[in-house]
Structure formats: C-alpha cells, structure tokens
Regions:
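Short beta-strand elements of ligand-binding domains
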Residues: 56-60, 82, 118-119
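Central regulatory/effector-binding core of bacterial HTH transcription factors
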Residues: 2-65, 145
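Hydrophobic hinge/microswitch elements
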Residues: 40-44, 49-53, 58-59, 123-171
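Short secondary-structure boundary/capping segments
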Residues: 26, 68-71, 99, 106-108, ...
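Secondary-structure junction motif
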Residues: 87-89, 96-135
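Short Pro/Gly-enriched coil loops immediately N-terminal to beta-strands
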Residues: 11, 49, 69-84, 107-111
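Anionic-ligand binding region
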Residues: 63-64, 76, 84, 92-98
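C-terminal effector-binding regulatory domain of bacterial HTH transcription factors
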Residues: 27-31, 94-103, 126, 166-171
Length: 171
C-alpha cells in the first residue's frame, strides 16, 4: 500500500493511542503517509461525512449511514477526584473510601464539589451528561474546556473533579 491516509482522530485518542499505534503501522506500511486532522468526535463525523478524512478514530461509536464502525476497544470513563476533596468529605475514612472507590464511586458523595468537564458537543461529554441525567445528578460546574489534558491538570491541581476516558488517565 502507498499513498496518503487522511486520518481524523479525537484529541484524547491522538494523545493516548497514536504514540503506540502509529510506529507499528508505519513499520508494516512504510509507503503510507498520514495527513492528521484532530478535533472532537462531532467535528470529525462532519469531516468524514463531507469526505475530508478517510477514517476517524474516536472513543465512542458513531451512527452514520453508509459508515462501517469497527470497535477497537471498550473504554471506561473515570471519575478523577483530587485527594484533598476525599480528605475533606470523608475525613479519617478518606483512605478507606479511596480504596473502595477503585471499584466504582457513588457520584452523589461529590454533589457539592466543583466539576471541570469537556464542553458540550463532545461525545464523552454527551455520555457524562446522560449519566448525570439518569442519576438525577446536577454537577457544580465551574469550568468547561475543549481539552481533556486541561481537565486532568485542573483535577491534579485540586481545582475540581473531572471525568475522562480511562486510557487517558493512565497516559
């Protein structure tokens, strides 16, 4: 194979997957060049629909007529909570609760804590909003951003809680 592959990829997938996958692909197909388009999943779907990219890689399935979807992996979303928040909420039981939350957290415990989320229109955000709605949870939203790295950095700095794909947290 040779030519140019116009690849659309979400920011999150690009950061988490490209460094691992691209070298292997290039080793197997050295004559293929890439033209990379990064954006949120909704924008990438539009690019695909209008023929500006050949394929897209994103975390959540797309529903477009005439498009074949090939699942590569299943990705869980993670609640990322600053340590200071669990200390504040649970006091002496904070360490015990952090261990318990490793298997899943009851989001209601964080009802009055600040949240930092990806902007609406992003598929991850759509999934998060659906979860909130099903659980009658209204987050105290203090910041929305286009960039998952920003949400993670803010959580790490103790500014707020965020939710993002598991693979991204491990990166």
């Amino acid at each position: 194979y040779m030519g140019v592959l116009r690849l659309g990829i979400s920011h999150t997938c690009g950061l988490a997957l490209l460094p691992e996958v691209l070298p292997k692909f290039q080793a197997e197909f050295p004559m293929v060049e890439f033209s990379l388009f990064e954006g949120n999943s909704t924008h990438l779907e539009d690019e695909l629909a209008h023929g500006r990219v050949d394929l897209i890689v994103c975390f959540q399935p797309i529903m477009m007529e005439g498009v074949e979807v090939v699942p590569l992996t299943q990705e869980d979303l993670m609640l990322v909570v600053p340590r200071s928040f669990t200390d504040q909420i649970f006091g002496d039981r904070a360490e015990e609760m952090r261990k318990q939350f490793a298997d899943g957290a009851d989001i209601d415990a964080f009802q009055h804590m600040p949240f930092i989320l990806i902007k609406r229109g992003n598929r991850t955000r759509n999934t998060v909003d659906q979860y909130f709605s099903r659980h009658f949870f209204k987050p105290k939203l203090i910041l929305e951003t286009e960039n998952t790295i920003t949400t993670l950095a803010m959580a790490e700095a103790g500014v707020g809680i965020t939710i993002c794909p598991e693979l991204f947290v491990k990166t």
